[in-house]
Amino acid sequence: MERILENAMYASRWLLAPIYFGLSLGLLALALKFFQEIIHVLPNVFTLAEADLVLVILSLIDMSLVGGLLVMVMISGYENFVSQLDIDDSKEKLSWLGKMDSSSLKMKVAASIVAISSIHLLRVFMDAQNISTDYLMWYVIIHMTFVVSAFVMGYLDRITKH
């Protein structure tokens, strides 16, 4: 009975595979939105104010960071919890493939969230005259919460490894 239960629990890790595949569909949706933004801004690039162009570029950077985060979570999550990826060595292989455990993934996700939050905060500050002081304060508080959380996670990870 114990062996059956253990085998069933071990096999249940495959339930994560469609979730990781779903993230790839999210990546596709993000790519479509990215190119929609590019197509929307290109005809107006010569008439846009510099600040508005910077806001669009920050939005594109934000989307690329989210896309990178999706790829990282998808691939390393699959490798850590479902099955090892069998990529032919003759093909291009990501340098971190097979080397990122759940702890390092957690730190990379935290760093990515801080970077994404920083870009969003910069975008908010560029439009600060149209945003109330209370909202600005909450944006900063939320961003600092992400920053402090990332530092605490890094510190805890460091002291548990030693």
Curated annotation (Swiss-Prot):
InterPro entries: UPF0114, UPF0114_bac
Pfam families (alphabetical): UPF0114
Keyword Magnesium: no
Keywords, comma-separated and alphabetical: Cell membrane, Membrane, Transmembrane, Transmembrane helix
Annotated GO CC locations: plasma membrane
Keyword DNA-binding recorded: no
Subcellular location: Cell membrane
Membrane topology (UniProt): Multi-pass membrane protein
Principal subcellular localisation of the protein: membrane
Membrane spanning residue stretches: 15-35, 53-73, 136-156
Stored NCBIfam families: HI0507
Similarity comment: family membership: Belongs to the UPF0114 family.
Name of protein: UPF0114 protein PSEEN0819
Lineage of the organism: Bacteria, Pseudomonadati, Pseudomonadota, Gammaproteobacteria, Pseudomonadales
